[in-house]
């Protein structure tokens, strides 16, 4: 798919894309209780999660209603994913808690991602692994209710272990610092507690005392990280937008912190009663921000930093190298195509803002990374541009291009 983007001014109201992080967690909750998700958007990552719980015995009706099995067991000995890193990393400890043997494989983007920390951790507790990357055969059953794991590679392992210890009727997790993307662990903890469980997270330790979980029926709330590209599009194009279907931002740093970050850079950016109001200003300020706890915000911040006055610095970026693409390199390449200079350091990237009238009108390949396409499309709204392999947005937000059209973006889809 090729998308041609012409200079446009974004305006209007848009519903935030459903949070795939929350959707995947809700789908995995169907291992314990009935879940009915209204109007579920079937992104590629969500489909990976659905296929995973189906392989563990969950009855799935119309890809929206999920009924837990009487007994959890591995129904399929081979689980094939597409590209959902969240699903993969949560699934590994879950199948280890259920016990048995299963082989997991996925597309090349996931095969490149390391699984070292979860393999190291669970190998100490009765689990055998064929390798530390995909394809991966897992054999055995967790032999301990008290797990130690390094927290530097992925928070998704810890989220998966919270599910695993609910399967084992309780236990504890000790996370060896540093703890990356802590906000996503807090999301999992909050979700279980909201459903009636008893999960405590103090310092670097999590204690799980399961209770029966209540059923859920409703719609998946919006995703601040994905919605931020609509906000970025408005700010770069000199427009305004209102984004609905978002929960109130939490106190801890996470994807929702983008509301505050954009405001600090000079934009009108306010949350009120479930709506995020965004309006462009004539100029934006540079910023220094650590995104280790919310790495998915990197491309949105980089996009606005491209036209901010002065030099911005995004730190805590080390794990961006193991996303759908090497996102550090992807940010550098995309900015360069639009005529924006940047400099990569050991754990940060400097972005040298320019006047937006100086932005180029390039052809950008999305590099099989949905966020590359979204960042580039926002920049292209200023002076135009072309996105190739633009179907990559289907990984997280299949409606992205239609949403831009509804916000008065001038684009053609080939």
Swiss-Prot record:
Q: Which GO terms describe its molecular function?
A: 3-phosphoshikimate 1-carboxyvinyltransferase activity
Tell me yes or no: is S-adenosyl-L-methionine among this UniProt entry's keywords: no
**Keywords (A to Z) from UniProt:** Amino-acid biosynthesis, Aromatic amino acid biosynthesis, Cytoplasm, Transferase
**Residues the record lists as binding phosphoenolpyruvate:** 20, 85, 113, 156, 327, 371, 395
Q: Which reaction does it catalyse?
A: 3-phosphoshikimate + phosphoenolpyruvate = 5-O-(1-carboxyvinyl)-3-phosphoshikimate + phosphate
Pfam families tied to this protein:
EPSP_synthase
Q: Which residues form the active site?
A: 296
Top-level taxon of origin: Archaea
- Where do the annotations place 3-phosphoshikimate binding? 20-21, 25, 154-156, 181, 296, 323
Enzyme Commission number(s) of this protein: 2.5.1.19
Primary enzyme class: transferase
List the pathway annotation.
Metabolic intermediate biosynthesis; chorismate biosynthesis
Provide the Gene Ontology terms for cellular component: cytoplasm
Tell me the GO BP annotations in alphabetical order. amino acid biosynthetic process; aromatic amino acid family biosynthetic process; chorismate biosynthetic process
Question: Does the keyword Amino-acid biosynthesis belong to this entry?
Answer: yes
Compartments, as annotated in UniProt? Cytoplasm
Q: What is its main location?
A: cytoplasm
Assembly and interactions? Monomer.
Entry function? Catalyzes the transfer of the enolpyruvyl moiety of phosphoenolpyruvate (PEP) to the 5-hydroxyl of shikimate-3-phosphate (S3P) to produce enolpyruvyl shikimate-3-phosphate and inorganic phosphate.
* PANTHER family to which the protein is assigned, alphabetical: AROM/DEHYDROQUINATE SYNTHASE, PENTAFUNCTIONAL AROM POLYPEPTIDE
**Which family does the similarity line name?**
Belongs to the EPSP synthase family.
**Annotated protein name in UniProt:** 3-phosphoshikimate 1-carboxyvinyltransferase
Which species? Answer: Saccharolobus islandicus (strain M.14.25 / Kamchatka #1) (Sulfolobus islandicus)
Q: What gene does this protein come from?
A: aroA
